[in-house]
Amino acid sequence: MRRDFGKVAVLLGGKSGEREVSLKSGAAVLAALRRNGVDAHAFDPAERALSELAGFDRVFIALHGRYGEDGTIQGALELMGIPYTGSGVMASSVGMDKWRTKLLWRAAGVVTPDFELVTADSNFDAIERKLGLPLFVKPANEGSSIGISKVKAAGGLQAAYALAAKSDPLVIAEQFVGGGEYTVGILGGAALPVIRIVPANEFYDYEAKYLRDDTQYLCPCGLDASLEEQIKAEALQAFRIVGGRGWGRVDFLMDEAGRHYFLEVNTSPGMTDHSLVPMGAKAVGLGFDELVLSILELAHVG
């Protein structure tokens, strides 16, 4: 593994609702780089002008959510000509937008739970009838399960929409799939082992992701080996369809009949002690430090 990365900025913090998670991810990445002799420096774009990045040779993006994961920072780095980790402008923008990701996947034949765009003047009862109950309501452009709620009873969609709309004007309602939550990490051109997520809460929300210690992460995931390999190949293809590159994560659900549905793509996954890509990497013998260096090795412009 090469170490001549030059001066590296670790982008962390930022202005999104996922700032605290990003600070944790960035601190872990920064420590790993420094342990391996990399000249790495923390850089919080909420506190410093982006023009100050001009003195850096590479950027490790540990930002999550708006401005860091949606193509905004990627576009700035493209203009500055500084190689950065993860996906480019288009894939970051599409991947952040759950609605457009699902539209693209559906057009390409990727199976995803049925969904509807919800607006203030939607026929809420008709959407409930079409998708069935329970259903999930999500802001299209938030991560870490911010603003998500589960509608269990008829007539509950309007209130769930109002909650989600506080986070983003674009809101989707999504069919409930109840057989289990899973994720596939992507590193370079390969999919990592599938991880099954078993939250103690009703679903894998912000609390389960970052604050609780009783969420179970199962790897091996319990799926038949041939099915797991099939899903890994499909996850890699789903990642590529949105233009993903470098590294990322693709989440999927299983229904009770054993059918899988791809849920969303994450182009800048978490790197905290609760995070999933490091778990998948560990399962193939790749430690956290080696994972961080591998991601930085894949930094690019264009």
Swiss-Prot record:
Q: Which GO terms describe its molecular function?
A: ATP binding; D-alanine-D-alanine ligase activity; metal ion binding
What Enzyme Commission number(s) apply to this enzyme?
Answer: 6.3.2.4
Q: Which residues bind ATP?
A: 128-183
Cross-referenced Pfam families: Dala_Dala_lig_C (PF07478), Dala_Dala_lig_N (PF01820)
Residues engaged in binding Mg(2+) 2: E264, N266
Q: Which UniProt keywords apply?
A: ATP-binding, Cell shape, Cell wall biogenesis/degradation, Cytoplasm, Ligase, Magnesium, Manganese, Metal-binding, Nucleotide-binding, Peptidoglycan synthesis
Q: Which reaction does it catalyse?
A: 2 D-alanine + ATP = D-alanyl-D-alanine + ADP + phosphate + H(+)
Q: Name one GO cellular component term.
A: cytosol
What GO biological process terms does the UniProt entry carry, in alphabetical order?
cell wall organization; peptidoglycan biosynthetic process; regulation of cell shape
Q: What does this protein do?
A: Cell wall formation.
NCBIfam families in UniProt: D_ala_D_alaTIGR, PRK01372.1
> Can you name this protein?
D-alanine--D-alanine ligase
Origin species, per record, is Methylobacillus flagellatus (strain ATCC 51484 / DSM 6875 / VKM B-1610 / KT)
